[in-house]
Each structure stands twice: as structure tokens, then as C-alpha cells.
């Protein structure tokens, strides 16, 4: 759900040209990758979400489960979540299932663009796609 869209990227450039252009440059590969493999017009930015969640855990909701990372075979690198407690092992991870998209982008953009959150006046419309 945390996708840096072309509209959000352009908004960043308008608010802080230097930072916006830098973000555009470093995310170009990811924009191309997500389009080629997933047909997403944008760049999924999970790493900033992880940092934002560390700062404000109320941005996300989820559940605690036992999780193991597969280290071989066709599912190499995938997370295996025991959501039904089949293995009866203690939870070792929190699996996040919901995110406050607006809250995240408000925090993210205000910090990297050096803007007060209330100065991001059209952010909610950009996220919802309501701009005309």
C-alpha cells in the first residue's frame, strides 16, 4: 500500500526540488522494476515504512506469529507464517497487515522535504487520486 507514485514524486519536486530530484534519481530503477514485473505505476517503498513504524508504531496494525524464512528450494527467501499456530511455537515476529497510508506519507514527506505536516495541503488528495 505504500507506493511512491509519479504524482507524489512530482509533488516532492515542487516542494523541494533538490530532494525531489534526488529521490527521483534513486528510485528510477524501482519504478521500472515494479512496472515490468508487477504492472505497478510507482515504487513500493517498504524500507521507509519500517523506519516510520519504529518511530510511530501506531501507523501499522498486525498480529504476532511464528515466522520462519525459507533458505532453500523454490520458496527461497520467502517468509513462512504459521498463522494457525500449527507448529505450536512462540511468536517471533509481528506481521503487519494494515497501514495508515496518509499518516505514513505525512511523516515521510514532512521529514525528508523539511516541511511542516500541515503544509502538505494536497497530500491526502494525491494519495486518494482525487486531484482534478
Regions found by a protein language model. Name each.
Residues 1-132:
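N-terminal acidic, glycine/proline-rich low-complexity segments
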Amino acid at each position: 500500500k505504500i507506493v511512491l507514485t509519479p504524482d507524489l514524486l512530482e509533488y516532492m519536486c515542487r516542494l523541494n526540488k533538490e530532494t525531489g530530484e534526488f529521490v527521483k534519481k534513486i528510485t528510477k530503477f524501482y519504478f521500472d522494476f515494479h512496472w515490468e514485473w508487477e504492472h505497478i505505476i510507482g515504487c513500493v517503498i517498504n524500507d521507509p515504512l519500517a523506519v516510520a513504524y519504529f518511530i510511530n508504531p501506531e501507523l501499522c496494525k498486525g498480529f504476532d506469529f511464528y515466522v520462519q524464512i525459507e533458505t532453500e528450494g523454490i520458496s527461497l527467501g520467502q517468509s513462512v507464517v504459521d498463522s494457525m499456530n500449527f507448529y505450536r511455537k512462540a511468536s517471533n515476529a509481528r506481521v503487519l497487515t494494515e497501514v495508515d497510508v496518509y499518516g505514513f506519507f505525512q511523516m515521510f514527506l514532512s521529514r525528508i522535504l523539511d516541511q511542516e505536516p500541515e503544509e502538505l495541503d494536497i497530500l491526502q488528495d494525491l494519495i486518494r487520486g482525487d486531484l482534478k
